[in-house]
Structure formats: C-alpha cells, structure tokens
C-alpha cells in the first residue's frame, strides 16, 4: 500500500490500491478435397472443411484448409459471422478445443482462428449499425428474432442507448415489449444505464424503468430507486413503482444518502461485479441527456471504480452534506484514483486538476477526514 503524504505532518495511507467430436468418432464419408486459396474460394466451405478434418484427426488437411481460410482475406467480423450464423457452431467449438492439442501447425491455427472469432464477436456486438439492425430483427421472423436477441445480449450495455430510446419513444408497442425482455436479460449491465436515466425521462418511462430494475433485481439500483421515490415532484404512481422495485432489489433503509454511501463503498472496494467489462481497457461512465439520450464516456478501467466511488459519494453529499463517511470515501477514492492512473492516461470525468490536487482536498477536509482515510487504507 502506498502512503499519501499530507501537509501539516498528517500521513494518510491509502490501500490502493472448435471443439471436439466424442472419443472414438469415425467418419465414414469419403475424404473431402482440399480447397486452394483463390479468388473463388468459398470461405464458409474452407471453415467447414477445417472443422471436419480436425474432428476426424487429419492434421495435414486441417492445416491446409485452415491456412487457406486465413489467407483468403477474411476479416475477424466475417469469420465470427460465419461461425455464429452457421449450423455447425457446436462442431466448431469442439474442433477448436481438439485442435489445440494437435500438431503445432494445427494448434497454432486453432488458436488463431479462435482468437479472431472472439475479436470479431467483440467488434460486431458493439457496432451501432449492427445494434440498430438487431433491434429491428426483434419483430421479424422467429429466426431473425433469435439472432437479434443473441446479438443484443452480446452487445450488453453497449446496446442500451438504442434499446432505451425505444422505451422512451414508445412508438411501437410490439417492439417495445421485445426490447423490454432483452433489457431484462442483459441484467446487471443494464442497471446503471437505466438508473442514470431515471431523473430525466418522463413519468411513464420512469415507471417502466422501475419495473425493469425490479425485474432484474440488482442491488446497485437501490439508491436511485429510493431517490426517485422520495422526490416530492415524482407522481404518486411512479413513487409506488419505485418503492416496489426498491424492495425487490433488497432495499430496506429509507435514507437516500446512506444508500449512495454504501454503493460508493462497494465501488471503492473495487467489487468486480460492479465493473461491466473487467478485461477491457475502458469501461463506460453513463450520463443521460434530454436531446442526445443515453451517452457513455470511456474511462480507463484501472480508475473506473474510483471514479464511480467519487460519483456515488458526491451524490450522497448532495442529500446529506454532513455525511462524514461519504466525504471520507470521496477523498480516499480521489487519492487512490490519482495513484492508480497510469502515465499518459486522463480522467474524462473528474479531470486532472493541477491547481488543487487530491492531497490538497484531503488536507482541506480536516484531520478527522484524513484519519478516516487512513483507516480505509489499512483495512
């Protein structure tokens, strides 16, 4: 743990921070010819043949077709589409798994193909145009609906701006019903995007969001739901929906500030379940705008939890300025954020205040706050 030097001799230390056929499988079909890489090469057939020869343990032929596939100029997105929208996805998974244990050539190809398929899935899932197309598919044929749902679930929170827009617009009841189901299936990744929109959407949409949050049942929503329920300007039917959802997510206290403080503490402790994509370089900080709708700002993942902790602590202080725990969490998260930020990184939410450093704010907050921060560091 790295100590934080604070003026006036106060030292605040902060704890910083595919797949294989069953054994013994015998393919009695005649050997398939090896396709050569050419302008006429059928990439789908090359992939199918690679899978086929891996599963029947023909490494030379598998390697030839795998190389031809990769040399054909196929993109990661095209490769992912071939796998995910084909009828042999299960066989692909088994072939990749078996291929890892075959000869060096096949093993390397299997790993490369698998890596590129995963990257392609990642790229496709978050593509805004593909998300738009996938939403339209929700009211198409049964097959289109299935593919649309799969794509949107893969997109996760990145689909939320367009999904929420359908709820806010409310112009197509059938599509809205399908979108609601998808949002509820996205589960925890949908919670913060929904919560930040709560104060700024119309009453009808507020009630719908409350119902979705209650159905998802993720406790992160608790302070936002209680805040809405206790707002004097909230219509009575929305208050009832908010309180109903609040109970469903496990809310018990009637103190909004304490709820935000508790969430700030969870972020400060860097609970992995609060990070939508722990393996990504960035995670989104969500805001809602009346005109632009839901917008995400990428924040470096290594400081994401501290940025969120500061945000939740600040919200707690809005409701209860004398909340000493919230103030201490804000100061501690600010110090840890500075410590965890890597060279060349910046914080697009709280910025890089060169005039007033985190140490300055820690000192200005007083001895008691610094002592609380020190206690957090050594816990």
Protein language model annotation of sequence segments:
Residues 77-99, 237-251, 258, 325-355, ...:
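TPR/TPR-like alpha-solenoid helical repeat scaffolds
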Residues 65-66, 225, 229, 246, ...:
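Inward-facing hydrophobic residues that define packing positions of alpha-helical scaffold repeats
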Residues 8-22:
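Bacterial N-terminal signal peptides
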